[in-house]
Amino acid sequence: MKKITEQLQEIISEYSEKLGQISETDFSIKPLPEKWSRKEELGHLIDSAHNNLRRFMVAQYETNPKIVYEQNRWVHMAGYQNQSSEELVVLWKGLNLQVVEVLKSMPEKNFSRPCNTGKTEIELHTLEWLAEDYVRHLKHHLHHILELEAIPY
C-alpha cells in the first residue's frame, strides 16, 4: 500500500498544478450536449474519491459491503458544471489527500478485505486491488482532462 500512497501523493502534487492552469472557459466546454465537460469529468473524479473513501473505510469493519453509485446521475446532481474550476480542483485535491491518509493508516491485515462493487451482480475486490484500480482510473481521467497521452482503463 506504501507504493500506492506514494503514487497518489505524486499525482496530487503534479496534476493539481496542471489542472490549475486550465482556463475557466476551457474547463467548461462540453464537446457534445451528452458528453461531460472537463469540469464534469473532474467532478466524476471527486465522486470516485467519495465512494472509494467509503469503500476503504467501511470494508475494514463490515463484511462484503456493497458500495456502488450511478456516475452520470452523481455528476448531474452535483452541478459541477455550475461551479468554478478552482473550487473543483481544491475539492479534488482535498479528497485525494484524505484517501492517502486512509490508505496510509490502514492495517496491512485489512488490505485483503473484500468490498462488493457490483451493481447487479456481486463483484468482490480486495481493498488493495481497489486502491490500485483507483490510481489507474484517476490517471486515465486526468490524462483525458489535460489532453495528455491516453492511458487505457
Model segments located where?
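Short helix-to-loop capping/linker segments positioned immediately adjacent to catalytic or ligand/cofactor-binding
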Residues: T25-K30, E86-L88
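Short acidic/polar alpha-helix capping motifs at helix-coil junctions
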Residues: K3-E6, E17-Q21, E62-P65, M77-Q81, ...
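Conserved catalytic core of Hanks-type protein kinase domains
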Residues: Q21, H44, A59, V102-S105
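Alpha-helical bundle segments that constitute or directly flank the non-heme di-iron/ferroxidase center
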Residues: M1-E24, D47-V58, E132-R136
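Short, contiguous alpha-helical
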Residues: S28-N72, P114-Y153
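Acidic/histidine-rich alpha-helical segments that form the ligand environment
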Residues: Q7-I11, K18, V75-R113
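Surface-exposed helix-capping loop/turn segments at secondary-structure junctions
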Residues: Q21-D26, K104-S112, E149-Y153
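Amphipathic, non-membrane alpha-helical segments in soluble helical-bundle scaffolds
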Residues: M1-Q9, K35-L42, S85-V89, E128-A131
